Swiss-Prot record:
Keywords: Cell projection, GTPase activation, Guanine-nucleotide releasing factor, Synapse
Subcellular location, record wording: Cell projection, Dendritic spine; Cell projection, Axon; Synapse
Stretch list, region Disordered: 29-84
Polar residues biased stretches: 54-67
Annotated PH domain residues: 303-462
UniProt comment concerning the protein's domains: The central Dbl homology (DH) domain functions as a guanine nucleotide exchange factor (GEF) that modulates the GTPases CDC42, RHOA and RAC1. Promotes the conversion of CDC42, RHOA and RAC1 from the GDP-bound to the GTP-bound form. The C-terminus is a Rho-GAP domain which stimulates GTP hydrolysis by RAC1, RAC2 and CDC42. The protein has a unique structure having two opposing regulatory activities toward small GTP-binding proteins.
Lineage: Eukaryota, Metazoa, Chordata, Craniata, Vertebrata
Species: Xenopus laevis (African clawed frog)
Biological processes, Gene Ontology terms: intracellular signal transduction
Name under which the protein is recorded: Active breakpoint cluster region-related protein
Top-rank taxon: Eukaryota
UniProt biased composition (Basic and acidic residues): 34-44
């Protein structure tokens, strides 16, 4: 973690945080319930009229008209007909801006009406023997609301007929000038706001009747709308005037931009803008920022140290949250739903003072019984769908007739798929406890990321932290500041990337983890490798544990598939054999991280076919490794073996004829060993074996070594499984043959079950006997593996995902004849390849003899 620099940390005055979250369009409400209405405000990433310099007291900028970029609700090129003068277009934009003001004012007035509605009955009961609130409490809560309501009601009533009977010569400047001169009433409201909130909160705690009233105020929709009244809390409505006070300033800038300088309104609007800016500047000067939540209890500025999107497991449901780590507290927020054209808003879900935050030990943690991990096949299918959509988007862009609407539709669908993947793929638990007993659980995809969060929090906890409790007002202000302070603006998905950003690498990265130096003591060490895939990091490989040394030498090679990857991470662990610290969850990593580091995968630097040596330094530890990259189109090519005496890269018919067997010896031996001692191995066939072990087995089988059985019995089971996959991958043509590839693709796409059955069985009969017998032998084995799914976590879907693209691939002729890149073919066909194998895996047992003599299937020749 880089040291926190005070110079780089943005700081906000409380009025800046209040006024940085607004939008002069119509207000929207989250429909999830009352809880979602609390602390609601409009958000805007762009604040052209408020100085955002990193000071404690940012001031409003009185910029000239020419320096202002106006905010227009609709693109002018869509709205404005051709042939009009610039002056006419500007005046039309004036009307559009004013129409937006009217719609916004109507909603704001409805909100104020909803807030005032309970005031009269409350006052009526105040003089009775059983008052709900005292007259003083009512005045404190509703202070200046009536004046603000009347001010905006008068403005709306006068502006509405002018806009409805629009004429380019019509003037509205006098209305905005009058509204600006009345802004002083907001000053009184702002000064009383915190006291009004505290009074309302105390009254809600003491009086059940008032609590019910304050939690369910009904705001009606626009008069021409059929929308039902929405339920909003009093706390949220009391914030609306503060949220509103700067909107007239934005509107004035827009009106000035689209008003000719010789128009009668121009000097009036300039005067209104001057008055409004002076008013807001005076508020900046009058308010003491130390009263607010942007300072710590010790009066020091509260700074944002780290933020990011994480998945929280809440009430047995996954929720995407934005986590903010400040110098003295951790705040968890959600992005509120907003209507089209509106900016994002945050809603605080909870916060923990760092003085009260603890990380539970494993013996204190409860196992995550309620967590149901998403099946791997669903994750892989979603990745395949995303790849297909990416290819379709590229096709649309390259096409001369490419429709921007079609591209946007595809991007929207891709965003939905990526959001699902981001939510359901993480499985590594990250627990946080409050000393008061409340606990929270996040799920991450990367132990690297979990370590970063833990280290950042623990570093801050070494300081002299004081207990704190934020008032509702302070929490509102802090949540509002998150929008401006955040460093991570978008969820980490690839559809957010611009076209000119690097798309990352697609293909296979070969990594040899050699050795490590710099450990202070002898112990048992190992490394894991992570790469980013579809916007988030995933653990891809793990070395063996090198025992009782301070200078481990692994010298292990791994083949890692890259899917738009841009970064490689290496984590170095020391094993923990304390039985009290054994993991309670399958995905819990309890070993100690000794160091971690990462390097960028530069497309230019790794495209070389030669090995590239590198070193990653981490906490005084140096890990040496080498890597090289092979593109995806190269991996589609099957290179025949130059030595026909071997088995790898040799036609299966040649091998079976030479061996005088129906199934190649390598297939039989690997399957026998897996069924003997790997049938219950978690992730069998999915977890990569050590590349050097696989190459050793490959060489032994090619040489027909007498020691092969001894090697198999001593070898890691994942290496044996990897050898079997490598054999099928290196066949000169896939097991299901090049000739039948398109027929399999068409057959699996049939909708009628009977027609599909007929076609798929006919295709099996069309295979050469060695291919068919070997395929049926493999099917029988994979079904046995899937029978142990509760233990090995490998379902039929998972196995189909692993073997489908290996047994069934397009031929090189089809690749060359395809207009798009090989990666496009890969993306489009991978789902179908998986579905073909899955169809046969889910089918009742298929006998070679019955299949050959069966008269059930009637089909024309392929």
């Amino acid at each position: 973690m880089e040291p926190v620099s005070h110079q780089d940390m943005p700081r906000l005055s409380w009025i800046d945080t209040l006024y940085s979250n607004f939008n002069y369009g119509t207000d929207g409400y989250d429909a999830e319930g009352n809880e979602e209405h609390k602390n609601s405000r409009e958000g805007s990433e762009t604040m052209p009229y408020i100085d955002e310099s990193p000071t404690m007291s940012p001031q409003l900028s009185a910029r000239s008209q020419d320096s202002v970029d106006g905010v227009s609700p609709t693109p002018t090129e869509v709205l404005l007909p051709g042939g009009e003068s610039e002056s006419d277009k500007g005046l039309l934009m004036r009307k559009l801006v004013l129409s937006g003001v009217l719609a916004s004012e109507e909603i704001y007035i409805n909100q104020l009406e909803a807030l005032l509605l309970p005031m009269k009955p409350l006052k009526a009961t105040a003089s009775t023997s059983q008052p709900v609130l005292t007259l003083q409490q009512i005045n404190d809560i509703f202070y200046k609301i009536e004046d603000i309501y009347q001010m905006h009601k008068d403005f709306y009533d006068k502006l509405c007929p002018i806009v409805q009977q629009w004429d380019n010569k019509t003037t509205v400047g006098h209305l905005f000038q009058k509204l600006a001169t009345q802004l002083g009433v907001y000053k009184a409201f702002v000064d009383n706001y915190k006291f009004a909130l505290e009074t309302a909160e105390k009254c809600s705690q003491c009086n059940v009747q008032f609590f019910k009233i304050s939690e369910d105020l009904k705001v009606k929709g626009p008069k021409d709308s059929k929308e039902q009244p929405q339920s909003v809390t009093m706390e949220a409505l009391l914030y609306k005037p503060i949220d509103r006070v700067t909107r007239s300033t934005l509107v004035l800038h827009d009106l000035l931009k689209h008003t000719p300088t010789d128009h009668p309104d121009y000097p009036l609007l300039q005067d209104a803008l001057r008055i409004s800016q002076n008013f807001l500047s005076s508020i900046n000067e009058d308010i003491d920022p130390r009263r607010t939540a942007v300072t710590t209890p010790k009066g020091e500025p509260r700074q944002l140290v780290k933020d990011g999107f994480l998945v929280e497991l809440s009430e047995n449901s996954r929720k995407l949250r934005h986590l903010f780590l400040f110098t003295d507290l951790l705040l968890c927020a959600k992005l509120k739903k907003t209507t089209v054209g509106k900016h994002q808003q945050y809603d605080c879900k909870w916060y923990i003072p760092l003085a009260d935050l603890v990380f539970p030990s494993l013996e204190e943690s409860e196992p995550i019984h309620q967590l149901h991990a998403t099946p791997d096949y669903e994750i892989e299918e979603m990745k395949a769908k995303i790849s297909v959509l990416k290819s379709e988007i590229q096709k649309e862009k390259k096409s001369n007739k490419g429709s921007s609407r079609a591209i946007e539709r595809l991007k929207k669908k891709m965003f939905e798929y990526e959001s699902w993947l981001l939510l359901y793929s993480p499985t590594i638990p990250f627990r946080i406890h409050n000393k008061n007993g409340k606990s929270y659980l996040f799920l991450l995809s990367s132990d690297y990321e979990r370590s970063e969060w833990r280290e950042a929090i623990q570093k801050l906890q070494k300081k002299d932290l004081q207990a704190l409790a934020l008032s509702p007002f302070e929490l509102q202000v802090l949540t509002a500041s998150c929008f401006k302070l955040r460093t991570v603006h978008n969820v980490p998905i690839i559809s957010h990337k611009d076209d000119d950003e690097s798309p990352g690498l697609y293909g296979f990265l070969h990594v040899i983890v050699k050795s490590a130096k710099g450990f202070s003591h002898s112990s048992n060490f190992y490394c894991t490798l992570e790469v980013d895939s579809f916007g988030y990091f995933v653990s891809k490989a793990k070395t063996r544990v090198f025992r009782d040394t301070s200078e481990p030498e692994w010298n292990e090679e791994f083949e890692i598939e890259l899917e738009g990857s841009q970064c490689l991470r290496i984590l170095c662990y020391e094993t923990c054999y304390d039985k009290s610290k054994l993991n309670k969850d399958n995905n819990e990593i309890v070993d100690k991280i000794m160091g971690k580091g990462q390097i960028q995968l530069d497309p230019q630097g790794v495209q070389s076919k030669n090995w590239h040596d590198d070193v990653i330094e981490m906490n005084g530890i140096k890990v040496e490794f080498s890597m090289k990259f092979s593109s995806r189109d190269m991996s589609l090519k099957r290179t025949p073996s130059k030595k026909q005496t071997g088995v790898f890269g040799v036609k299966i018919s040649v091998v079976t004829k030479r061996e005088r067997s129906k199934v190649p010896y390598i297939v039989r031996q690997c399957i026998e060993e897996v069924e003997k001692r790997g049938i219950e191995e978690v992730g069998i066939y999915r977890i990569s074996g050590v590349a050097t072990d696989i190459q050793a087995l490959k060489a032994a089988f090619d040489a027909n070594s007498k020691d092969i059985l001894m090697m198999l019995s001593d070898m890691d089971i994942n290496a044996i499984a990897g050898t079997l996959k490598l054999y099928f991958r290196e066949l000169p043509e896939p097991l299901l043959t090049d000739r039948l590839y398109l027929a399999f693709m068409e057959g699996i796409a049939l909708s009628d079950p009977a027609a599909k059955e007929n076609c798929m069985m006919h295709l099996l009969r069309s295979l050469p006997d060695p291919n068919l017998i070997t395929f049926l032998f493999l099917l029988h084995h994979l079904k046995k593996v899937a029978e142990n799914e509760p233990i090995n976590k490998m379902s039929l879907h998972n196995l189909a995902t692993v073997f489908g693209p290996t047994l069934l691939r397009p031929s090189e002729v089809e690749i060359k004849g395809h207009m798009n890149l090989a990666s496009d073919i890969w993306s489009h066909d991978v789902m179908a390849q998986v579905q073909v194998l899955l169809y046969y895996l889910q089918h009742p047992p298929i006998s070679f003899s019955e299949l050959k003599r069966s008269t059930l299937y009637y089909s024309t020749d392929v």
